[in-house]
Amino acid sequence: MIIVLLGAPGAGKGTQSVLVAEKYGLKHISTGDLLREEIANNTELGKQAKKLIDGGNLVPDEMILGLLKNAFLNRGKGVVLDGFPRTLSQAEMMHPIVKGLAEKLSAVINIKLSEDEITQRIVLRRQCKNCGNIFNLRFIKNFDGKCPKCGSTDIYQRADDNEESAKNRINVYHSQTEPVVGFYKNKTYYKEVDGSKNKEEVFEEISKFINRKK
């Protein structure tokens, strides 16, 4: 089974990807995590990627697709792709790779959210340094300064989680990622869900659709 989760920044792709992976026993794949792993392991690909990133350049699609191919080799029951493909060219390049696998593309789920909600979520997003948990103050009543997952007080806000950055990322989403939605929109395995609901409700809607497409 191969599941793709799309959506604007702050829509909850990461959260829902983890939940889907846990429920269906799938491998959670984030291209950002794959890149960071290659860089941390000082692989040849990691060295090339680091040089590009340090120079303020984007990592080319070919390099990302190479990472994805390697990740697919150890996919087990299947994968959840977290926020990938991000561009139309990535979607087009990924298509023949998926066609060559035994599993089919089971579901492409687009988490919809208004621009105001996206901005608020990005600004209120926090991460735990201890366990890596990402959470949102918007959904926590009477936040006590502790990570909801591990209880650590070592909480921080990522440097790019601010209003100006949110606007820039929304613009990039409209110009680069919305065409990906058009690529999949008329497929029977495409589904839009309302991301303004709480994560449990969103997950329930996603799960119902996946169950129908398994």
Curated annotation (Swiss-Prot):
It catalyses: AMP + ATP = 2 ADP. It comes from the Bacteria. AMP binds at residues 31, 36, 57-59, 83-86, 90, 158, 169. ATP binds at residues 10-15, 125, 134-135, 197. Residues 124-161 are annotated as: LID. One of its GO terms (molecular function) is adenylate kinase activity. Pathway: Purine metabolism; AMP biosynthesis via salvage pathway; AMP from ADP: step 1/1. This is Adenylate kinase.
